Amino acid sequence: MFHVKQPLINCQIIRTLLPAGSGVSRETGEKLALYESLLTRWTRTVNLVSRNDVEHIRDRHILDSLQLLPLLEPLPGPLIDIGSGGGLPGLVLAIATGRETHLVEADQRKAAFLREAARATESNVTVHACRIEQCNIAPAPVLTARALAPLNVLLGYALRLLSKNGVALFMKGKTAEQELTEAATEWHMRVQLSPSRTHPEASILRIDEISRV
């Protein structure tokens, strides 16, 4: 069904990131490999990932994004991914789960890539080519972002885009704990911090019960 030259994404590797008992089909591996091929090709002309990372897209970006699967698995309903860029993590999660996903990306060229990749991988995705502040999207139960903005800013987006009892999953770098300390002066929230399994200095923040101080 999907014709790609490079090896398929190893489904056994994906399974290590999933809750016990979850299955990953060969078709999912094929779709992720197709996405990887498209991301590599488009990056030659559109700045989707760092040029230094082109040879490491699978490990540094795709598998990194798949780390959210165990946190996402118990959360029902649509997902909104903001600042989607090259589809990390939003499109990767849409491919892996089949979940209804909304990708928000203001850059028109990146949005064009997202539409093409979503079409090619037959993903349940809607691309919103607009600034986060200006997008008219119904609130969703899950919000994701990866290396997008300071936590204070992300929480402001979450307050508007998350539905009642919604959960934010933010992928942060080595400043995660500092950002949490700073955000605590302006926000009430419940936080679960998990170390990244692909980047030693990175973290994943699971945040809910968000409100302003």
UniProtKB/Swiss-Prot annotation:
Give the EC number. Answer: 2.1.1.170
Reaction it catalyzes? guanosine(527) in 16S rRNA + S-adenosyl-L-methionine = N(7)-methylguanosine(527) in 16S rRNA + S-adenosyl-L-homocysteine
Q: Name one GO cellular component term.
A: cytosol
Q: Annotated Gene Ontology MF terms?
A: rRNA (guanine-N7-)-methyltransferase activity
Q: Which CDD domains match?
A: AdoMet_MTases
Q: Which UniProt keywords apply?
A: Cytoplasm, Methyltransferase, rRNA processing, S-adenosyl-L-methionine, Transferase
> In which domain of life is the source organism classified?
Bacteria
Q: Where is the signal peptide?
A: none
Q: Does Iron show up as a keyword for this record?
A: no
> Where in this chain does the entry annotate a coiled-coil region?
none
Chief place of localization: cytoplasm
Q: Where in the cell is it found?
A: Cytoplasm
- Report whether Ubl conjugation shows up as a keyword of the record: no
Q: Where does S-adenosyl-L-methionine bind?
A: 83, 88, 132-133, 146
- Which InterPro entries does the record match to this protein? rRNA_ssu_MeTfrase_G, SAM-dependent_MTases_sf
Q: Which Pfam families match?
A: GidB
Which PANTHER family does the annotation name?
Answer: S-ADENOSYL-L-METHIONINE-DEPENDENT METHYLTRANSFERASES SUPERFAMILY PROTEIN
Q: Which family does it belong to?
A: Belongs to the methyltransferase superfamily. RNA methyltransferase RsmG family.
**Function as written in the Swiss-Prot or TrEMBL entry:** Specifically methylates the N7 position of guanine in position 527 of 16S rRNA.
Entry protein name? Ribosomal RNA small subunit methyltransferase G
Question: Which species?
Answer: Granulibacter bethesdensis (strain ATCC BAA-1260 / CGDNIH1)
What is the gene name?
Answer: rsmG
